[in-house]
């Protein structure tokens, strides 16, 4: 999960890419005590994905509304696996 990019589309149509860093993952774990990120991937809960996007955008320097108002501005979240990122890099 660390190093995975998120493509986050907000309801205003703006699109941002932010990386799941250790800082983002730790913030997510603090907000979801007792839960593992791997379990989130297997048993998808929309609020957890929204919070991951929220933290990733904040850590990337994107100005977002405070949680939970951020949820109302969220349009879509796409996970970009590490392997696909490597494929898109020039030789």
PLM features: residue spans?
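Charged interaction scaffolds used for protein-protein
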Residues: 1-16, 23-91
